[in-house]
Each structure stands twice: as C-alpha cells, then as structure tokens.
Amino acid sequence: MTREFELENNYQLCDEIGRGRFGTITRCFSPATKEFYACKTIDKRVLIDALDRECIETEPRIMAMLPPHPNIIRIFDLYETEDSLAIVMELVDPPMTIYDRLISAGGRLSESESASYAKQILSALAHCHRCDVVHRDVKPDNVLVDLVSGGVKLCDFGSAVWLGGETAEGVVGTPYYVAPEVVMGRKYDEKVDIWSAGVVIYTMLAGEPPFNGETAEDIFESILRGNLRFPPKKFGSVSSEAKDLLRKMICRDVSRRFSAEDALRHSWMMNVGNLQSN
C-alpha cells in the first residue's frame, strides 16, 4: 500500500543496520504492533536512469504478487514522496546474510548447515516459480540468516521479473552467480535461479564460487567453459549426494537442469536432518 510519506507518524526510527546502493536500512518500531521492523529508505535523487527507477519499483510490486512464505522476507508497508521511498519489511535480527555467515564461520560452512540453508532457499524459489516469478539475483548477500532459529529468508527482489508464461531476457544478476544462458544473451526462464542457487550452495561448502576471474568478463568466460570441479582440498569431506545435486543444478543444459521441486526431492535434501556437522 503506497501512501504519502507518513512513516514517522507510524514508526519510530532506530539505528541504521545496513546500507545499499540507493539508501539505508534502519531498524524501526511500531507502537501499534509493539514489534520491530526493517525500513529500507531510498533517496530517489540518487537514481541515475530509468533502469535504477525500475529496480526500486520492482521489489514492492513483485513481492505484493507473492503469497507469504516462511523463507521469503515480507513487506508490510510502503511510503512514498517525490524524493523518497520507504519500504517497511520483516526484520531479521541481528541482520546477517549468508555472506556474513561465511565470514564469521571462517570462509565455509559445514555440510549440515549448508544443506539446511539450501533446502530453505530452494523452498523459497519453488514458491516464487509457482507464482511465475524469477528472482534473477540469488546470491549469498540476498539471503538473510537467523542464527537463533536456523531459518533463512530470500530478500532483495529488485531484479525480479514476472514471466506471465513467457521467457525473460537481459543480463541481470551478479557475475559469479549468473547462468550461462544469461551470459550468452539468450531468452531464459526460472531455471536461471537454480543455477544461481547451486553456485550459492557450492560457495557455502567450498568457501568460494566454482567459476572465478579477476574481471566480470573473465568470470563469464569461466562460466561458459562450464568445467564444474570439486577440488579434494575443498570437497574431500563433502558427501557424494551433495556433489550430485550440485551437478544437476549447475548444469549448462537447461533442459537437464533441475527445477526447484526436483532439487527438493533429491536425496541430499530429503536427508537434511540426518547430516552430521563436519
């Protein structure tokens, strides 16, 4: 619901908990609900072009189309003026992304923790894809982690698109996580998210993405070569089931690449609760 900028009338703004390309994220409190939320405030004056404006308008529009899901961040309120846009969202406290978690864990996660997060990410993507929504920027920075509950939430739908039974096009996303069909400029569907999620899972297990380079062009070339490897130094203690799922998600042949539902039915995902920490 978009309204005139009455944010301060309904929420008490507290401390800054994050900063993005277009603005800040602040913890805020609602006297009406007695709960804390996250408020993303965007300064429209820093928007450079139509693409920037489309990006900030896309997130609330797409998320309004999605029924609530436990692994997708929720939007509760929207306030707008000529110069500002404020989005009041569900708060994960303390705020931590999978990227932050990787750093705090020393660079990589145990197989059991990785599998737990992977299952929740795939559940969120399956929900999006059933609604014909493609996220297009699945990466560690866009998955929030609640260390107390072990829950994760997919966030930042600024690059998302509703397919409406069609395909999408355009190079969107973050180089390390972009699917090869996107790099090649082809039309694509929701399976680009599966490739990206596979790269996120690989990164959690190995501490680095499978395709690297010093520049975006170098990374894209590595992606197009598509040589998925599991170095023993990084994957020596990782189960064969985990590596099998990664091969089926980080698969250049889109027709053979798993869907989110396929991945959730894989044996590695079915046995999440039985995996031991390593």
Curated annotation (Swiss-Prot):
Keyword Cytoplasm included in the entry's annotation: no
GO molecular function: ATP binding; protein serine kinase activity; protein serine/threonine kinase activity
Entry-linked Pfam families: Pkinase
Residue span, Protein kinase domain: 11-269
Active site annotation, chain numbering: D137
InterPro entries: CDPK_Ser/Thr_kinases (IPR050205), Kinase-like_dom_sf (IPR011009), Prot_kinase_dom (IPR000719), Protein_kinase_ATP_BS (IPR017441), Ser/Thr_kinase_AS (IPR008271)
Signal peptide as annotated in the record: none
EC number: 2.7.11.1
Keywords: ATP-binding, Kinase, Nucleotide-binding, Pyruvate, Serine/threonine-protein kinase, Transferase
Annotated PROSITE patterns: PROTEIN_KINASE_ATP, PROTEIN_KINASE_DOM, PROTEIN_KINASE_ST
CDD domains per record: STKc_CAMK
Reaction equation(s) it catalyzes: L-seryl-[protein] + ATP = O-phospho-L-seryl-[protein] + ADP + H(+); L-threonyl-[protein] + ATP = O-phospho-L-threonyl-[protein] + ADP + H(+)
Lineage top rank: taxon: Eukaryota
Binding site for ATP: I17, G18, R19, G20, R21, F22, G23, T24, I25, K40
Entry annotated with the keyword Phosphoprotein: no
Stored SMART domains: S_TKc (SM00220)
Induction data: Up-regulated by light, cycloheximide, phosphate starvation, carbon availability and high pH. Down-regulated by phosphate and phosphite. Very high sensitivity to phosphate at low pH. Not under circadian control and not affected by nitrogen supply.
GO biological-process terms attached to the record: cellular response to phosphate starvation; protein phosphorylation; response to cycloheximide; response to light stimulus
Tissue: Expressed in flowers and roots, and at lower levels in cauline leaves. Barely detectable in rosette leaves and stems.
Family: Belongs to the protein kinase superfamily. Ser/Thr protein kinase family.
Further comment found in the protein's record: Lacks the autoinhibitory region and EF hands found in calcium-dependent protein kinases.
Role, per record: Calcium-independent kinase involved in light-dependent phosphoenolpyruvate carboxylase phosphorylation.
Protein name as it appears in the record: Phosphoenolpyruvate carboxylase kinase 2
Lineage, highest ranks first: Eukaryota, Viridiplantae, Streptophyta, Embryophyta, Tracheophyta
Gene: PPCK2
